[in-house]
């Protein structure tokens, strides 16, 4: 059997979907240690609760009011020496025999870890792209409005000034525009590396760890 334990606060997992109230089980990524050797992060199937609440050793709380999506159950989980069967190790990429011997078809720990969490990485990359796209759309609207909307007389008594001619308006928007440009370039670079790894064009341990 394995023992799942989060001995300190930083080992807890926060903002888990269905973690605070509804989830009955979870795939827990934890360091796999056998015979005193840490084989890196692996995935374990862990039951969380039954109809009466959390199972022994499992704890969790709701993450409280968020900035949005408060209809979604988000919570934190922690474990106090929860024992699970050896067969609860999701062992496609690494397995442990009854005597504690570890084997894996992927020799490199970095490559093994990236292979296991590849789907999660893809989700993070997509989230980054969505955030950049949202920033672009918001700034496009704000800057376009600022170049068309006129307000207050300045140099002319006949025609009001466009908002973007005011320094205060520029100072609020242009730094955000520069940051969004930088984020967009960084995201494009990330996508290139991500595609190189997953397509096999440049699948190295260094790129996987990056």
Feature-to-residue mapping (PLM):
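Amphipathic, small/basic residue-rich leader segments at the start of a protein or domain
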Residues: 2-3, 195-206
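A short core secondary-structure module
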Residues: 5-59
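A glycine-rich, basic-preceded beta-loop-alpha segment at the flavin cofactor/substrate interface
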Residues: 16-18, 78-123, 143-165
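Structural beta-strand/beta-sheet cores of well-ordered domains, especially the beta-sheet scaffolds
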Residues: 24-28, 39-42, 73-80, 86, ...
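Flexible, small-/acidic-enriched active-site or ligand-binding loops
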Residues: 55-81
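Extended amphipathic alpha-helical segments enriched in small hydrophobics
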Residues: 118-200
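Charged, glycine-rich active-site and insertion segments that engage polyanionic ligands
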Residues: 209-210
